[in-house]
């Protein structure tokens, strides 16, 4: 392992999809990694591939950000690990369901992960980055945050929150050498989609 001049990137939702791609690309650019997700087996697999291919130091944290104890553990890492220079807030929960037939507990979990956990991680990372002289925060939003559609009202609202929060903090943090950006992906076929049944219910004949 070679010491990273760029520091360490902590990535949530890193076991598959966009999070795993971020892990791969950041490792190629010289970052060491802390990968966070719910599945330890999947995390271990991603970590091994990256470590073997690029020789970066890769640490994993099994955490469900919808669980307060797990979330607090990740916050503590952000506050206390001086090597961390980037936070990628990628973990999220989605669903495709009319409001009238939705389960309110599922909606609450979506808000907890997409809004509350993301916000708490930003506020764990930002003061630490300022004290260390700089850093980068990437918040995963969605095109649905600016273009709401039916069946995705709560999800789109959570992503609109992410966009608003990011814009609000951009000026404040840029003056302290901390960059923050919101990423607004459109339709991306990932395991996240399979879990929310988006593919079969919204685009049954358009994706292969």
Per-range role (PLM):
Residues 15-16:
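Conserved glycine-rich cofactor-binding loop
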Residues 122, 158:
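Active-site helix of classical SDR
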């Amino acid at each position: 392992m070679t010491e990273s001049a760029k520091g360490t990137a902590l990535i949530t939702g890193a076991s598959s999809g966009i999070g795993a791609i971020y892990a791969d690309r950041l490792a190629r650019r010289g970052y060491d990694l802390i990968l966070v997700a719910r599945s330890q087996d999947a995390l271990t697999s991603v970590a091994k591939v990256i470590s073997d291919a690029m020789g970066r130091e890769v640490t994993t944290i099994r955490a469900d950000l919808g669980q307060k104890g797990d979330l607090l553990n990740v916050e503590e890492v952000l506050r206390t690990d001086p090597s961390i220079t980037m936070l990628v807030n990628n973990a999220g929960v989605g669903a495709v369901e009319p409001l009238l037939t939705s389960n309110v507990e599922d909606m609450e979990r979506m808000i907890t992960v997409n809004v509350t956990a993301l916000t708490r991680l930003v506020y764990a990372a930002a003061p630490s980055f300022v004290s260390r002289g700089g850093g980068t925060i990437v918040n995963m939003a969605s095109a649905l945050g600016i273009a709401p559609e039916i069946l995705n009202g709560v999800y789109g609202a959570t992503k609109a929150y992410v966009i608003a929060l990011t814009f609000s903090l951009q000026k404040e943090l840029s003056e302290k050498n901390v960059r923050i950006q919101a990423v607004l992906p459109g339709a991306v076929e990932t395991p996240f989609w399979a879990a929310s049944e988006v593919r079969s219910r919204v685009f049954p004949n358009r994706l292969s």
